[in-house]
Amino acid sequence: MRIFGIILLSFCLCFASILSLNEAFNVKSNSYNNSISIDIELGKDIYLYSNKLKLYINEKDISSLINLPQSSTRGNENVYYQKLNLALPNLLLERFAKNTTNLIKLEFQGCSEQGLCYNPQTWYFDLISKKDAFEISKPYKAQKTDKKTKIESEESSIANFLATDNFFWILLSFFGYGLLLSLTPCILPMIPILSSLIVAKSNAKFSKKYSFFLSFIYVFFMSLAYAIAGVIASFLGASIQGILQKPIILILFALIFIAFAFAMFGAFRFELPLRFQTFIHKKSEKGKGVVGIAIMGFLSALIVGPCVAAPLAGALIYIANTGNALLGGSALFIMSFGMGIPLLFIGLGLGFIKPGFWMEKVKIFFGFVMLAMAIWILSRIIEENYILIAYGILGVFFSVFMGIFEKSFTIISKIKKSILILILAYSLSIFLGGLFGAKNFLNPLNFNTISASKHALSYDYINNFEQLKQEIQTNTKPIMLDFTASWCENCKLLDELTFSDERIIQKMQNYKLIKVDVSENNNEQIKTMKEFNVFGPPVLIFFENGKEKLKITGFISADDLLKKIEP
């Protein structure tokens, strides 16, 4: 355990010298009789790129009309150090500032000598035209807009928070995000996996302490996977989940879960070679099995986790924009660890279970859970009616193996048998429903029902970025881009639950609807996702008059979507 503490401490110390945005760039403004000035004071070892410096008055670029100071040369780039003064004489202002209240926009990007590049920065100033003079306001970050206009998406605000706040506040906040995510369905697929692994390792020496230790190993490596995958994904410019959701990869991991299930049934055992077992036994009497727990924790985060939530997307946007992979990776690690806190309590609770013969039934139960997880993984690439058939068959076998035909004498055994009868009845219904083409788990015997949600909304399918860009700029109607994929579970939920709602269908009649299918994760799709700052479906982006107004990452209910898009 001590080594984990050392690793985390070293991880944190890496950021001791990193300046926050406020420390790196201090923007000021002043008004004079014949001019105004904008000053950018730079922190220690910070420099600005001259070709990234832009100044606008009422959306008109006046960068080429400003007398800039002499720049320094750094490699092949012209840069500014220490302080940059931008003087704007009244004669220039009178040419472009025709209104009483005008808007000045300043854009720049800077880096530090340590190799860190900050987000491109945008600052705004109000320019008031008075008789024979101009007055400039103090700088502010967010452009003032009508209350009905929604500019910043949730993940963008999180990315900006990463870029501007204190390092330890960032980690604490992302730990809080993780705790909130633990209250959502994101964590549910992890529970049966961890529980079955712990039960599989049970023996006479099984204890609360050891159970908690196994849970910690699982959560630690799950968190490590999120951090590593996030950093790699940012460098690739696409979601690592998109790569790992290829059909061949999904089939491979489904086979792994099937293998674990048969191991639960006692068909075979996973064991290290004898030489390694002897080495581990010498190091720790309880060491055997920890490697397997760690591997499953790592893989569970990459494959089983169904959510690409706003905190994750926000961290990825920050990493991609700045190259600060360590800070973004740390935030992802802490967020994932917070998300795994309930798993630690589950492991601790399993430690109170006393082993005995009845545990064999528990292992069989979790074996079927593993098979259910394998089917769930394959549901991303197989038609829904075939998935119903598979679950129906699994339910029948589960009822038999768990003792539906055994005699019942006690109240507990009778309750158990009643539950198994209900499971058997439901399993037969979804099996028959699947045979006749049904796709709804809640209404499997309604054979004539065809999901209206898939046909209620009319979409155009465009995957080419240039075509999307042209459509956004030229279309007179508001536009909704729907980033989706065949393997995306939450995308299916959006279609089945949110976009089947009559209120949403009615509201969407005012929009041009475009689906962007990123199932294949090819170069064109990766480019499109990168251009729109999308790190994994589902993502909904709303445009109006060629400008992005709202971005939603992950599943959203019909009620919540209406609140966001209604004026």
From Swiss-Prot:
Q: What is its EC number?
A: 1.8.1.8
Record field: catalytic activity: [protein]-dithiol + NAD(+) = [protein]-disulfide + NADH + H(+); [protein]-dithiol + NADP(+) = [protein]-disulfide + NADPH + H(+)
Q: Which GO terms describe its biological process?
A: cell redox homeostasis; cytochrome complex assembly
Keyword flag NAD: yes
Keywords attached to this Swiss-Prot or TrEMBL record, sorted alphabetically, are: Cell inner membrane, Cell membrane, Cytochrome c-type biogenesis, Disulfide bond, Electron transport, Membrane, NAD, Oxidoreductase, Redox-active center, Signal, Transmembrane, Transmembrane helix, Transport
The GO molecular function terms of this record are: electron transfer activity; protein-disulfide reductase [NAD(P)H] activity
* SUPFAM superfamilies reported for this sequence: Thiol:disulfide interchange protein DsbD, N-terminal domain (DsbD-alpha) (SSF74863), Thioredoxin-like (SSF52833)
Please state every residue range assigned to the domain named Thioredoxin. 430-567
User: According to its UniProt record, where is this protein located?
Assistant: Cell inner membrane
Spell out where the chain crosses the membrane: 167-187, 212-232, 248-268, 290-310, 333-353, 362-382, 386-406, 418-438
* Top-level taxonomic group: Bacteria
Protein family according to the UniProt entry: Belongs to the thioredoxin family. DsbD subfamily.
Protein name, as recorded: Thiol:disulfide interchange protein DsbD
* Source species: Campylobacter jejuni subsp. jejuni serotype O:2 (strain ATCC 700819 / NCTC 11168)
**Lineage, please?**
Bacteria, Pseudomonadati, Campylobacterota, Epsilonproteobacteria, Campylobacterales
